[in-house]
Amino acid sequence: MTRRPSNLDPAIAARLKRDEHGLFPAVAQQYDTGEVLMVGWMDDEALHRTLTTGRCTYWSRSRQEYWVKGETSGHQQWVKSVALDCDGDTVLVKVDQIGAACHTGDRTCFDAGQLPAVVGEPPTPVGAGERQPASGTADAAP
């Protein structure tokens, strides 16, 4: 596993699960609307910079360097909160997005079109208009 030097708090670093390149996904979400904006990659140092500067820093897998969202485009991400998921392998960064989040110039990277999917419906909750049999009996009468 590739690990670049980092100033990340060791207690936070110990909670992270990384891929073979020392990276983990970071989901950027608009803090006030819940809109999912983009997914980038971070390593320990990118997370440290994100936590300590108030700006999202990512690791570019193609350029092999750190980049601060909006540094050249002006489409900045201002950090509102950062949370680690239950498995420790993904972070959710809630941001105030200024301008486009996507490199295409779109607000979000997730507007390239819906995929055909079967839409599921949850079952009707118990007690939603019909009487259920008593526990341990077969169709108990009222």
UniProtKB/Swiss-Prot annotation:
Annotated Gene Ontology cellular component terms: cytoplasm
Pfam families: PRA-CH (PF01502)
GO biological process, one term: L-histidine biosynthetic process
Superkingdom of this protein's organism: Bacteria
Disordered: annotated span: 120-142
Enzyme Commission number(s) of this protein: 3.5.4.19
Function: Catalyzes the hydrolysis of the adenine ring of phosphoribosyl-AMP.
Name the record gives this protein: Phosphoribosyl-AMP cyclohydrolase
Organism: Acidothermus cellulolyticus (strain ATCC 43068 / DSM 8971 / 11B)
Name of the gene this protein is made from: hisI
